[in-house]
Design a protein with these regions (language model features):
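Phosphate-handling DNA/RNA-contact segment within nucleic-acid enzymes
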Residues: 31-37, 44-46, 87-234, 247-248
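Non-catalytic accessory segments of DNA primases and related replication-initiation nucleases
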Residues: 1-107, 111, 126, 138, ...
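Short beta-alpha connecting loops at secondary-structure transitions
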Residues: 235-239
């Protein structure tokens, strides 16, 4: 039996087309149109940043060294892995290209200082993993620090940070790799759930494309609902250390 990963509305439209039933979609309200327009703006902002991060990856020896020690060049390109450099490079690039800074702020890519209102990049010195929703739209990023340096207070930056929550990205409703995994997972009726983005990509490179990861938190009910839409069997794979085993138990 063939499975399709469709939303309810998409499923109704698909069945209507199959059996010649006319599907009358109601006119959207002004509020719905405004929300749809905002979502499209955020998708475009993420696409703009993703292209920049990919270009910067090709210019960074440190980013390439880190990534190539873990994955092949083909896998790096397939997953759109990029690099966010220092010195507010994305902000400067956006100004040079006359991109909409407000959209980049709304997308969580540019931050505004609460002290003096100056703008700065949300991701600095990080390998960038694009995050897609179930239909393939780019909704955010997860950034992995590659050369951690302690701040003035002696603390190292977080190993991973994700895009802050936006109208198109909710951490507790998103699984990294879900878009890439859903068709193969549905066909195999099996989904691997691992701890982090590198684990997803590593397993996908050895024919385990049916692999996802939560966004740094324990699995939520909405993430579990996503899993149940496509499979009935799940394998939980933790890192081979006490913290990893505990994380999987929490999940």
């Amino acid at each position: 039996m063939e499975r399709r990963t469709l939303t309810f509305v998409e499923a109704c439209q698909h069945l209507g087309n199959m059996y010649g039933i006319k599907w009358d979609e109601k006119e959207p309200t002004p509020e719905e149109l405004a929300a749809r327009f905002e979502r499209e703006q955020l998708f475009r902002a993420n696409d703009f940043a993703a292209e920049f991060f990919r270009d910067q990856y090709k210019l960074s020896e440190a980013a390439q060294k880190y990534a190539q020690e873990r994955w092949s060049d083909a896998i790096i390109e397939e997953w759109g892995i990029g690099y966010a450099p220092h010195k507010n490079a994305l902000l400067r690039h956006a100004k040079d290209k006359k991109a909409n800074i407000d959209d980049l702020i709304k997308a969580g890519l540019i931050k505004v200082s609460g002290e003096d209102g100056h703008y700065y990049d949300a991701f600095i010195g990080r390998l960038m993993f694009p995050i897609r929703n179930r239909t393939g739209n780019l909704v955010g990023f997860s950034g992995r620090i590659i050369n951690p340096k302690k701040n003035a207070e002696g603390r190292e930056p977080a190993k991973y940070i994700n895009t802050s929550e936006t109208p198109i990205f909710k951490k507790g409703e998103t699984l990294f790799g879900y878009f890439e995994a859903q068709r193969i997972a549905a066909r195999r009726d099996l989904l691997n759930i691992v701890e982090g983005q590198p684990d997803v990509i590593r397993l996908a490179s050895i024919d385990q494309q049916n692999t996802v990861a939560p966004m740094g938190t324990a699995l939520t009910s909405k993430q579990i609902d996503l899993v149940k839409k496509i499979v009935s069997k799940v394998v939980l794979i933790g890192d081979n250390d006490p913290a990893g085993q505990t994380a999987i138990v929490d999940h």
